Amino acid sequence: VSFRDRTKKKTAENYFMTLNVFPDMLAVPDKYYLGSVNLDFIGMGNMIAYDSVAMVRDGFYDLTLEESSYATNQWSVSEEVTAFYAMANLEMEVAGREVTGNVGVRYLQTDQSSTAFARSGGDLVQQTVSHDYNNVLPSLNLRMALDEQQTIRFGIAKTMSRPRMDEMNASFSIGVSQVPDVYGNYIGAGGGNTTLEPKEALGIDLTYENYFADDGYFAIALYRKELKEWIFDGAAEIDVSNFLAATGQTTPDGSTTATVNGKVNGGDGTLTGYEVSLAMPLSLLHESLDGWGIFASHTGVSSDIKAPGGADFELPGLSKSIQQATVYYENGGFEARLSVRKRDDFKGDLYGLGFSVEQYEMLGETIADAQISYDFSGSGIEYLEGLRVYLQGVNLTDEPFTSLNGGVVRDYQEYGENYRLGFSYDF
């Protein structure tokens, strides 16, 4: 049995900045001037760069707090989760071969609530909304040894992934219309959804492993996940009678149901994929290659998931293809390795204005890292026993991070190469 209680709060104070000599203009003083920044990647050329934070701090701007219009950006979300676990080990014989594994089940009871503001024009009403649900998550894992070096593994499990806490906040903006919407409601709103529940998946995994040497193995894994209750942008209906009573607003027919545009559970689909991996000491090929080795893997993934309206949907963070390769050399405490990872384009989340989270297309990348190190444990130098020194190089090809919105560059960042020199000592 376990219990977890977590709370997330967002406090957003937004100010409108007005230059203190407005409507006159002011040249940027030299002490704040930082040069220029190149914006060629979005077709804007060079742009002035200056220390705007310092200018605010030194009183060049008058700040006006925008309380009402940004009140819905402030909220708190709490979540209490009680979990019960049970597991039993399995040991049996199938077709003359030993099969081991375990079977288990997890029951979770979740109580969540959110306190936030509802807004309509200049009217603000603080509200607390609660929601509770439960989940039952069974699992089965089996392992069959074909011989001393070959193994087959099988797993099936129901899993879940909780919504982001900011998606469950109780804040929204309300508008009352004289004409009903497609749902027959006169009230429209936009904001969070306090009734969001976890995304669910039923996953099946099958893996073949071949340990052909002490430090070598080959493996191929196949997997399939049935996805349900995925979270999309959509519409839900909620009762806003408390808000209407507090503000004195009414609808033409006296109804109190609002159509809220935000995140909703709905739609389902499948995720299928495979992974092939190989680890091999090259001394298996020739004794002159003693100490050399490789590790390589390739992952391929495809998904078929539909939004509630039937449109195709791309899962965030999912690249259709990922390759990774490492070459290493180890000998007498010395170790060197070079790794390269390549992934295709994928969808991802970035913070937008007001710290809202928005989804964009992230371009694929190829990143190379390297490391050399020496462990003095086997050096024969007594006072250096336990010392290990290393030099790391990260992003050696200076791969940029690029995101697109509608085919136009949204964000472009160059991190440059990163080198680290360090040591560790075991007493």
Regions found by a protein language model. Name each.
Residues 9-73, 182-191, 237-264, 339:
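Flexible glycine-rich, low-complexity coil/linker segments exposed to the extracellular/periplasmic environment
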Residues 222-227, 236, 243-351:
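Gram-negative outer-membrane beta-barrel transporters
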Residues 1, 10-12, 93-100, 147-149, ...:
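Short loop/turn motifs that connect adjacent beta-strands in outer-membrane beta-barrel proteins
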Residues 73-77, 160-227, 247-274, 279-282, ...:
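Outer-membrane beta-barrel signature, preferentially recognizing the C-terminal barrel domain
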